[in-house]
Amino acid sequence: IYVDSGILRLESGILTGNKCEDVDANGVDRGGAVGVRSGTFIMTGGEITDNTCDAGKNGAGIYVYEGPSVTIGGNAKIYGNRTADGMNSNLSVGNGESSSTIINLSTDSPLTSEAKICIRVSTDSNGKQITTSCTDLKDVFVSDNDSYEITTKDGEEGIFYTKKNLLAAVPHHPLQHLTI
């Protein structure tokens, strides 16, 4: 499904088994199930799972080009989508996002703990705010990129996409002297 204007609503059902391979007449080469170039995509239920795209591409589930409006709510599930070479590629947000947050949360159908949103954001997005609220539902969001994690910040509302501190994750081992 390609969104170039207007509104696409997904309230129930499953988008599965789709594949985005080559650039089509609209210049779309991403978004196995949904490609959002402009317009609005609202997902308050249903699942987007088991879709694929070419190796090295993003958005086997949903690819959001710069600037569009994405609203998530209810028990929406975006998971299990992969590139041809096996990389997790669920909800991917491209470079040049125009707003300070990546996802708007639905006020008509509030996000629930049953939702599952796996996400990958452009590589220069350390500290990018995913949502402006729902810190209690942080675990609904999962990073597709092993170098990033979903976090909250003390004293700030919202959920963030943050580069992992890999040095903090490595245990410190004192040097051991070997006797030969």
Predicted feature descriptions by range:
Residues 1-4, 31-40, 70, 90, ...:
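Extended, compositionally biased low-complexity polar/Lys-Gly-rich tracts
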Residues 14, 38, 42, 47, ...:
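A detector of low-complexity, intrinsically disordered, Ser/Thr/Gly/Pro/Ala-rich segments
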Residues 5, 21, 44, 66-68, ...:
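Generic signature of intrinsically disordered, low-complexity segments enriched in small/polar residues
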Residues 1-2, 19-37, 52-65, 84-96:
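Extracellular beta-strand/beta-solenoid scaffold signature
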